[in-house]
């Protein structure tokens, strides 16, 4: 397999993990807050087939921005519909950030203590791409424009008249945002935000670096 083919294979596998985690996060939050609509539709699952959208997944793999089937919610089932929708929306990016943190922990453990083999190099590359994609999904979805998760979070703080006035143009706004992303117009701001989140995750797993350095210097002392 060529290097480019391997790259896209790993990105495909990463997408099949990151996207279901995001959507299952929405479904879990909705269920915990009193709405079982997504659970009844089978969306409380990490099975990629439950969330799979062919075009959205292909766009994620090849263009870096994509989508899955939207998770259905019924605001009437929430005790507080406004905050129920906002917290359910927030749960998707939070799920991605949690997965990114766990992937970075695993990646560092592999980097410091696993023997260097062809297999461990592939796993390390998978974990690294998983962190990148999860961070990218979280950051992109928090953009406060419809129909991204950030717009649902705005519902909790904006007057309903303004919010629903904006939502009338949801499809047009989405096309503009996707065109801006694919055209590279948002590369700068998104890169800055992605790097910021990556650095925070790196800082949050710094204890692994310290343990690795301490172990290394202790082994030097034992040899001496």
List the predicted regions and their residue ranges.
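Hydrophobic transmembrane alpha-helices and their immediate loop junctions
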Residues: 1-224
């Amino acid at each position: 397999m060529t290097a480019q083919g391997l790259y896209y294979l790993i990105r495909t596998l990463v997408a099949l993990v990151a996207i279901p985690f995001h959507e299952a996060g929405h479904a879990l939050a909705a269920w915990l807050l009193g709405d079982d609509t997504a659970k009844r539709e089978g969306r409380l699952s990490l099975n990629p087939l439950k969330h799979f959208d062919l075009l959205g997944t292909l766009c994620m793999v090849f263009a870096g921005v994509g989508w899955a089937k939207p998770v259905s919610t019924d605001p009437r089932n929430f005790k507080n519909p406004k905050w129920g929708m906002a917290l359910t929306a927030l749960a998707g990016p939070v799920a991605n950030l949690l997965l990114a943190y766990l992937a970075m922990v695993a990646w560092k453990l592999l980097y410091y203590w696993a023997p260097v083999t062809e297999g461990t190099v592939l796993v390390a590359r998978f974990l690294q791409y998983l962190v990148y994609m999860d961070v990218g999904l979280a950051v992109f979805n928090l953009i406060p424009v419809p129909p991204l998760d950030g717009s649902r979070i705005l519902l909790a703080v904006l007057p309903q008249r303004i919010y629903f006035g904006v939502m009338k143009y949801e499809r047009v706004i989405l096309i503009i945002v996707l065109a801006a992303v694919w055209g590279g117009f948002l590369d700068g701001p998104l890169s800055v935000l992605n790097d910021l989140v990556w650095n925070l995750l790196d800082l949050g797993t710094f204890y692994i670096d310290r343990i690795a350095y301490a172990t290394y210097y202790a082994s030097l002392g034992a040899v001496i």
